[in-house]
Amino acid sequence: MTITDLLLILFIAALLAYALYDQFIMPRRNGPTLLSIALLRRGRVDSVIFVGLVAILIYNNVTSHGAQMTTWLLSALALMGFYIFWIRTPRIIFKQRGFFFANVWIEYNRIKEMNLSEDGVLVMQLEQRRLLIRVRNIDDLEKIYKLLIENQ
């Protein structure tokens, strides 16, 4: 097993750990989930570049008669990238004392102000950071508003 294979195994394990954390562990942290809202995906250009580069590496490894283990590991890496970028849906998860946004826990008392832009983006101003929350379904903004009013 080469260093390349070990690095591929490390990256696959990291992506798998992230996927498991995102799907199964994060919704169970910090109490029961009050509301889970699907968000719009950010630009897919990065994901296309990543999966395309891995596909080029697979092609190069196959045509140069490289190790089969490396080909399988590259294929697994491409599948993990495909899952994370195209199948998994980003979510905002509201709990009793705060919410998870982009896998970061934010307590409600950190919100200094909230605004709704004309194009349906909820803007939350924190102490030093601004969150731009783009929901997939515009009706979910009303659910978020009701939940925040109930918990404040």
UniProtKB/Swiss-Prot annotation:
Cellular compartments annotated: Cell inner membrane
Cystines in this chain: none
Main location: membrane
One Pfam family here: DUF986
Xref: InterPro entries: DUF986
Annotated membrane topology: Multi-pass membrane protein
Superkingdom of the organism of origin: Bacteria
NCBIfam families noted in UniProt: PRK02913.1
Protein family according to the UniProt entry: Belongs to the UPF0266 family.
Protein name as catalogued: UPF0266 membrane protein YobD
Organism: Salmonella paratyphi C (strain RKS4594)
